[in-house]
């Protein structure tokens, strides 16, 4: 067996920590080894928040920390606390590639800063700029990812949730146009109590209001499914929950369909080509029931509606942290297998 790829995580917030936990929970340690975490926060806080998580519970692996050294399940991980890519000596840690979970960097130029310092590839855990080499959405285009793609984005949690569903409908019935409302749990860029923020809506207490926010989801769909350019629009609101997101999808089909036909196609795909990525349920569930669910998207078949044979409404759920972190891990594992180390 070849040695595991040596990777670094830059940014150890909600997604960075979920990614590391998913790596161990899924048994991927033999193919991917985290050797460095860069996070400006104190080392003690890094270890504490890895051990204890308000949404996902206690981490099942033993975690210890001494100075700027973290040990997870016996694996040693170095800690650094920089804010700039160039300030980190990636070569000294023999890093093969970086999973960037900062939410700050995301352009080709940012990726090149890593490559110039000996990193072979970089994977952004958030939507990249249009100039990145590739945006990978598992279940849709991951087979097109090659070793020549050096600067890669994993898209967003909402793109990963909705694009596989859109592709299933488009392949089966054809899509003329669509509109999406993302009903997203509160995030770190919101306020606990009213406080200043450049976005005036996000100056308001996250636990007290449903808050509209900007989204570029429609443009993300176009990047993955370019033949649907100009056919989708999206809005988003944040709601007073800490995790799990619902997506309200409305599409106009190119051919007639019934509720039963639509649900059958989605159910079949969840059991076949999209098993592990798309799930389907008809249980009377609520958002908390999808907490720590590893799927990109879960279609609630009880909420499927059809008007005039072609206007379709669907409700899809996702754990916007855990589901996305699992897809990030899938992409990282694929990149590790492709990359010489």
From Swiss-Prot:
**Stored InterPro entries:** E4P_DH_bac, GlycerAld/Erythrose_P_DH, GlycerAld_3-P_DH_cat, GlycerAld_3-P_DH_NAD(P)-bd, NAD(P)-bd_dom_sf
Chief place of localization: cytoplasm
Q: Where does substrate bind?
A: 156-158, 202, 215-216, 238
Pathway field: Cofactor biosynthesis; pyridoxine 5'-phosphate biosynthesis; pyridoxine 5'-phosphate from D-erythrose 4-phosphate: step 1/5
Instruction: Give the residues the record marks as binding NAD(+).
Output: 14-15, 320
Keyword Protein biosynthesis in annotation: no
Localization per Swiss-Prot or TrEMBL: Cytoplasm
State a GO cellular component annotated for this protein: cytoplasm
Q: Reaction catalysed? A: D-erythrose 4-phosphate + NAD(+) + H2O = 4-phospho-D-erythronate + NADH + 2 H(+)
Q: Name one Pfam family in it.
A: Gp_dh_C
Q: What does this protein do?
A: Catalyzes the NAD-dependent conversion of D-erythrose 4-phosphate to 4-phosphoerythronate.
Family designation:
Belongs to the glyceraldehyde-3-phosphate dehydrogenase family. Epd subfamily.
Tell me how this protein assembles: Homotetramer.
Name assigned to this protein = D-erythrose-4-phosphate dehydrogenase
Upper lineage ranks?
Bacteria, Pseudomonadati, Pseudomonadota, Gammaproteobacteria, Alteromonadales
What is the primary gene name for this protein?
A: epd
